[in-house]
Amino acid sequence: MDLRFVQQLECVPDTEGGEAAFVVLEQIVEKGAKRRFGCIGKIEKNRLAHEFELIRATDTAKLFLYWADIVAAIRQKIYPYIYSVQNCSLVCYCLGITEVNPLLAGSYFERLLTRRSTHVPILFIEVPKGRGREASESLGGEVKSLIEIEENAALPDLDPIDVMDFFKRATFENRELLQSAAASLGLAGQKPLETVRALADLLVYKRYKEFMDEKPSLLYQEDAVDLLVKAGLSYEEAECARRAFAMKNRAEIDCCRNAFERAARKNGYSIGEANAIFSAVEKEINFTVCRASYVAMAQYLYMNTFLQDKTKG
C-alpha cells in the first residue's frame, strides 16, 4: 500500500481497532441495507461483498465509520449535501452517508478506492450559506484535511428531518416534478424527462456547455471506464488508467496502454482495435464527469422542487 495513503489514514480516529472496525462496519452496513432495500437481493449482496473486499484490503473500515459519524453529527442540525465520490459506494449508501444508490447510477466503487490509491478520498460537504462554522464544529482538528465543508448560497436551509423523510419515500418517478425541476434551471426541452438520470444529463450539459461543441461521445467517467473494462481490464486497472489520463501522467499512461493491449488481445481484439479504444478514451477523458455526483445533484434538485410545491400547496 502507498506510504502516503497509510500516513493520511493514520489521522482518522480509531474508535475500533483493526479487525474490530471491519466487523462493526459489516454489522452497521447490514442493518442499513435492510433499511434501504428490505430484502437484500443478490446484486446488492455481490456489490457489498466486492466493496468489503477492497475496504479490507486497504484497511479503511475506520474511515467509512468516521464518515458516517460525521455526516450523522452534522445532520442533527444541518442537512449536509454530498456531491463527492462517496456517491459511488453502496457501503456509503447503506451507512446513510449518501442518498445515491450507485447501482441505479451505474457507478463503480473503484472510483472511490482501489488497492493502488495514493491518497485517502476527501469527503466534500456543502451546507447552506452561514452554516459552515456550525458544521465544522463536528470535525476534529487532525482530520480537517480529509473532510472539506463549503458554504453554498444556492442551497436551501431545510430542516434535516424534512429532507430525510423525503428520501425515505422518494422514487424520483414523477414526470411533472422532473420537468418542473428542469424548468427551474431553464433546462426543460421538448422531450419529457422520465428518470432522474435524464435530469442529471441535462445538468451536465448546462454546466459544461462550452465543451459540448466538441461533441464528445463520452459524457461520464463511468462510460469511459466501462469501455476499458469491456475490452479486458479490471475496474481497478481501468480506474488507474482514467486517473493517469486525467493527470496526463505519460509514464503511467504508457504502462496502462501495455496492460490494456495484453488484456484486449486475450479478449479477441486486434492491436489496432485496442489502440483505437484506448486512444479514444484518453482523448475524451477530460470531457467526462462522475455520473454519481450529478445524480446526487439531480436528486437534490428534484427534492427542492417537491418541497417547494408542497409549501405552495
Where is each model-derived feature located?
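Alpha-helical scaffold/interaction cores of sigma-54-like transcription cofactors
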Residues: 1-313
